UniProtKB/Swiss-Prot annotation:
Keyword Chaperone recorded: no
Interaction with NR3C1: annotated span: 371-861
Motif (Nuclear localization signal): 32-47
Primary gene name: Clock
Regulation: induction: Without light exposure, high levels at ZT6 and low levels at ZT18 and ZT22. Light exposure increases levels in the SCN in phase dependent manner. Levels increased significantly during the subjective night (ZT10-20). In the piriform cortex, levels increased by light at ZT14.
The organism of origin for this protein: Rattus norvegicus (Rat)
InterPro entries xrefs: bHLH_dom, CLOCK-like, HLH_DNA-bd_sf, Nuc_translocat, PAC, PAS, PAS-like_dom_sf, PAS_fold
Catalytic activity: L-lysyl-[protein] + acetyl-CoA = N(6)-acetyl-L-lysyl-[protein] + CoA + H(+)
Known EC number: 2.3.1.48
Segments forming domain PAC: 336-379
Predominant subcellular localization, coarse grouping: cytoplasm
Protein name: Circadian locomoter output cycles protein kaput
Residue segments, region Disordered: 388-497, 623-652, 768-802, 822-862
Amino acid sequence: MLFTVSCSKMSSIVDRDDSSIFDGLVEEDDKDKAKRVSRNKSEKKRRDQFNVLIKELGSMLPGNARKMDKSTVLQKSIDFLRKHKEITAQSDASEIRQDWKPTFLSNEEFTQLMLEALDGFFLAIMTDGSIIYVSETVTSLLEHLPSDLVDQSIFNFIPEGEHSEVYKILSTHLLESDSLTPEDLKSKNQLEFCCHMLRGTIDPKEPSTYEYVRFIGNFKSLNSVSTSTHNGFEGTIQRTHRPSYEDRVCFVATVRLATPQFIKEMCTVEEPNEEFTSRHSLEWKFLFLDHRAPPIIGYLPFEVLGTSGYDYYHVDDLESLAKCHEHLMQYGKGKSCYYRFLTKGQQWIWLQTHYYITYHQWNSRPEFIVCTHTVVSYAEVRAERRRELGVEESLPETAADKSQDSGSDNRINTVSLKEALERFDHSPTPSASSRSSRKSSHTAVSDPSSTPTKIPTDTSTPPRPHLPAHEKMTQRRSSFSSQSINSQSVGSSLTQPAMSQAANLPIPQGMSQFQLSAQLGAMQHLKDQLEQRTRMIEANIHRQQEELRKIQEQLQMVHGQGLQMFLQQSNPGLNLGSVQLSSGNSNIQQLTPINMQGQVVPVNQIQSGVNAGHVSTGQHMIQQQTLQSTSTQSQQSVMSGHSQPTSLPNQTPSTLTAPLYNTMVISQPAAGSMVPIPSSMPQNSTQSATVTTFTQDRQIRFSQGQQLVTKLVTAPVACGAVMVPSTMLMGQVVTAYPTFATQQQQAQALSVTQQQQQQQQQQQQQQQQQPQQAQQPQSQQSSQDQPHPSVQQPAQLTQPPQQFLQTSRLLHGNPSTQLILSAAFPLQQSTFPPSHHQQHQQQQLHRHRTDSLTDPSKVQPQ
């Protein structure tokens, strides 16, 4: 039993051990599983973060249009970092040491400030003395523009006595530099010397002034100049230096003034045309300054308020500014001249001001002055001042101006002209001063072994290079007139100086045939351009001459035909003097001028007399012609005191447009009579004849069309003038005959009995109105505003196309010159309505005056 119990105990112990082992194994598996899960999570998180970083890095790299894998992104990142490290190393090597400049300034800003502080400018000179680069700070120091110095010789700006010294310095180093390497040129070639340089002036006629300067610089090899340079230095070298130059060495120096300037003449304007506004009192004190002013003039508003503007102006500009301000106070607005304004940095800046006066809105008194100041560059100021002085600008500026004057399609390429001629001037010679001597004095090229050629003794103005072809072209354009110019001769004369210069220039031994052919080709191209321009000018001359010839022919036609009109601007109308109408054979001149007032009367057709005559016009200009009588078979007969047969020539319809006065006076030497005024407005010249006739029943008949006969009353006056109304039906011009023809066969229209009855009535009315003769001027004045009856005698016409003029108002005018057209054979009073009775009485009063003024011996018997 004991064995059995022990066995059972041992089995129970074994079971417990197995279960504990199994449990331990399960626990270990659970722990491992948890670790693996945790490890997988952390690994996934790391991979996700890595992918995000790779993606972000790939998006920052250039050229990420396509999706890149991780290795490509990492490779490009490595390349970028390596390149950035190299650039940083180069920048550190070329960077100015931090103990020199503040950290907030760039290299260019610090260089500009250093030049201004040192009163200096950069200058690059070739070993022969030609200037290839100059910085803009030369303007504030020597008043030269950079364009004045570039491509010039340094000897043009140095006194003649210092030429040999400067030339010796440059040429000596030229001989030494032949055996030096570019590395030696960088370390062992510093040079320093002093000389005088010419100051620039606005007026070249002013006496020359020289400034003592110091050159400090090194010789640089142009072969080692980097391709990326600042301030256009590379462009200047490429334009100026040709492959023919063998040395390729230039002297780059900092030029400083020996005597510092406490106040600069002017500062360099980086952005011209900047503006700012200020407000001044009538005493020219600052009242307001806008926010744009401090960056330009340096002053804050509170620093200038209450101060006078004259405190900041240059002393040389005060007189001109005072005149401008006087003009402002006189006219209320204006524009100032160019003047210098002192900035806070003690520099002069050029300004121009537009100003006007504002007035109080209640009392209209001047309140203050509003000014708009514009910054201008010194180049613009100098160009304007030289234009006022009549001095031509330097060659680049004048060439640009002249190219703008010519047409855009036919403009001469002045840049190519300049460069083509510069190829000859820049031809290399063994002499280092030959080029400067040619530019300064146009003398012969010096011998290679001789001393440098000196500039002319007259150094009052800096010599400028003059291109012969440009001079000829300027002279040709200035002296150009209306006469024609031979294009071939002009073209040859223009190009001959340049060709002769090219022929006289010594050709160096090293110049190739290709360069010579290129120069000749440039000259041929220049010649073709000049000839083309000349042909264009000649064509313009011929065209203008043809137009002038046509105008002269028209003037001769007008003067030859004789009628002249004088326009008087003081009168509202047109004053026609001594008008003469033309007809058949004899000539009868008018004596009194025609005055037409009032309105413009267009005349489509005017036909009068036997033939359909009208006032002849030539190209809408009234032409003076003499009045001529025609044959008796084409006459219109009218009974008058002293009548003559007249007629007007039959001409084609014309249009007459002229402003007419209220009175048109046509003189006639005869006594007063009844005047018929025939006129027509035919639509067709072939219409049948129309005659206005009177029948025995005293009724007026019109054969064709709607016609209205103006009632005209005549009274003989010494001057014998005919008054024409200003308002006429259909705008027709009324022309009355000065003389009238009588024929026996046309006098039968009115009987003798009617004449006797009329004479009796006239005598009775004269007796009744004798007490009223004292009031005659008043009655005549009132009669001008009333229509007067008239009787028109029938006219027998030999030419068919006739119609009578239609008018609607009475002729009126000055009583002393008025000829009231009265009826020589008036109808009975019953012919007219009762309203005309008083008018007829006034007619009889004028008739009485006519009888007293008319010479009975000149009146033909009825």
